[in-house]
Amino acid sequence: MASGKFITFEGIDGAGKTTHLAWFCERLQGRLAAAGRQVVVTREPGGTQLGEKLREILLNQPMDLETEALLMFAARREHLALVIEPALARGDWVVSDRFTDATFAYQGGGRGLPRDKLETLERWVQGGFQPDLTVLFDVAPQVASERRGAARMPDKFESESDAFFSRTRAEYLRRAEEAPHRFAIVDATRSIPEIRQQLERVLAAL
């Protein structure tokens, strides 16, 4: 653990990733404390003052598909410049609730934006930068829908159909298949204790 690492949590809405993020980060911080390193917890869209303003717009206002993707990457560039890159340079670890895989899954898989357009934006905004580890919480859209139904007032993405989330999930799994060295897939249909057992194995491998 000599240098900072970047970890992302991904999954469709209702997969339960946010439920486990604080627990995971607390466990990770316990391992890093002896080395004097911190865990920076953040999210996308968001993580910066500008990013949080864009988050409010992106999650609640209808807009053109390409506009949506551009705003996602604009928020990401600010996030990288102000939060992620400085933290990693300090040797800290960063754990983000979503990153670029979400854009490929939601705007690409879910909304149907051509992959080559997203790849162009990814190269421009990130260069070759990718997470060291992506923890993908995988769950069937029907299960996720039942979980979301008991939640607060849904945003525009949470209100999407099971068909939308089927496409989103398929894109997540495709990306995981293309980069198995980067992804750890968690069976998010399991109980909370069982999911945390899976996450313990992820932590042990870091």
Curated annotation (Swiss-Prot):
Its EC number is 2.7.4.9. It comes from the Bacteria. InterPro entries: P-loop_NTPase, Thymidylate_kin-like_dom, Thymidylate_kinase. One of its GO terms (cellular component) is cytosol. It catalyses: dTMP + ATP = dTDP + ADP. SUPFAM superfamilies: P-loop containing nucleoside triphosphate hydrolases (SSF52540). One of its GO terms (biological process) is dUDP biosynthetic process. It is an enzyme of class 2 (transferase). Belongs to the thymidylate kinase family. It comes from Burkholderia cenocepacia (strain ATCC BAA-245 / DSM 16553 / LMG 16656 / NCTC 13227 / J2315 / CF5610) (Burkholderia cepacia (strain J2315)). Transmembrane segments: none annotated. Keywords: ATP-binding, Kinase, Nucleotide biosynthesis, Nucleotide-binding, Transferase. This is Thymidylate kinase. Phosphorylation of dTMP to form dTDP in both de novo and salvage pathways of dTTP synthesis. It holds the Pfam family Thymidylate_kin. GO terms for molecular function: ATP binding; dTMP kinase activity. ATP binds at G11, I12, D13, G14, A15, G16, K17, T18.
